[in-house]
Amino acid sequence: MTDKIIELKNVTFRYDENQEKPTLNNISFHVKHGEWLSIIGHNGSGKSTTVRLIDGLLEAESGQILIEGHKLSEDNVWDIRHKISMVFQNPDNQFVGATVEDDIAFGLENKGIPLKEMRERVVEALNLVDMSDFKTREPARLSGGQKQRVAIAGAVAMRPSIIILDEATSMLDPEGRLELIGTIQKIREQYGMTVISITHDLDEVTLSDRVLVMKNGQIESSSSPRELFSRGDELLDLGLDIPFTSTIIKALRQIGFTFDNRYLLEKELEDKLWALISKK
């Protein structure tokens, strides 16, 4: 069995056959089982198009997409979709149930899950995202963060191999974003799911195993978060903010402190500062 759960080989895509420049131009990359891959890049770089191709919502002009070793095609697209759950930027567009628990059960009913198992999955999913107390609420009456947690609960209840988050945290306040990212991390650890996250959020990127940078429909780079953050001011051109520790290090350099070019986590920066101060 291959360790690649997703693989794209020389994939090209156009929304319109008369489109001179393809939206995606001969891209190739893979995602490993259980990996958290963040995809970043400016609007129009091809991020959302890529994940919609993986889920079979769009069809590639050329190239191959393999999910768990199976080439995605018209014949198996529905089977492939059962392995993947997507959570979008605006959860209101995904709600169909009158209550939170009804909404989570909807996808399970369509899948033909027996009633007893369905109830167990709904309870488990709500507990996992800390929304059990809201099970009889109308989704429309929830806060933005609560809605996204319900959307994630619905995705998890389907027991997919892969969860795709298409800017799922972008409309939340900082506290709601951190809570949701923590929930995703907990789900990943508990179920060993593969996570693909389209994001501009530094906390999300930091938690990922690998970061794919997309630019003009192509793969600009693939690296660890630490390697990416070491690129300094280039991050602004990639649609990311400068990490807090990088800003502090830049200011300290200006007053005479010496640092190498390696990106430091907050704890590492704290230890480095204590070491420098103790030498004074």
From Swiss-Prot:
Residues annotated as signal peptide: none
GO cellular component, one term: ATP-binding cassette (ABC) transporter complex
Compartments (UniProt record): Cell membrane
Pfam family, one: ABC_tran
Major location (coarse): membrane
InterPro entries xref list: AAA+_ATPase, ABC_transporter-like_ATP-bd, ABC_transporter-like_CS, ABC_transpr_CbiO/EcfA_su, ECF_ABC_transporter_ATP-bd, EcfA_1, P-loop_NTPase
Keywords: ATP-binding, Cell membrane, Membrane, Nucleotide-binding, Translocase, Transport
Enzyme Commission code(s) on record: 7.-.-.-
Topology with respect to the bilayer: Peripheral membrane protein
SUPFAM superfamilies hit by this protein: P-loop containing nucleoside triphosphate hydrolases (SSF52540)
Gene Ontology molecular functions: ATP binding; ATP hydrolysis activity; ATPase-coupled transmembrane transporter activity
Enzyme class: translocase
Binding site residues for ATP: G41, H42, N43, G44, S45, G46, K47, S48
Occurrences of domain ABC transporter (ranges): 6-241
Keyword Phosphoprotein tagged: no
Claim: Lipid metabolism is one of the keywords in the record: no
Subunit structure: Forms a stable energy-coupling factor (ECF) transporter complex composed of 2 membrane-embedded substrate-binding proteins (S component), 2 ATP-binding proteins (A component) and 2 transmembrane proteins (T component).
PANTHER family registered for this protein in UniProt: ENERGY-COUPLING FACTOR TRANSPORTER ATP-BINDING PROTEIN ECFA1, HEAVY METAL TRANSPORTER
Record's function text: ATP-binding (A) component of a common energy-coupling factor (ECF) ABC-transporter complex. Unlike classic ABC transporters this ECF transporter provides the energy necessary to transport a number of different substrates.
Official protein name in the record: Energy-coupling factor transporter ATP-binding protein EcfA1
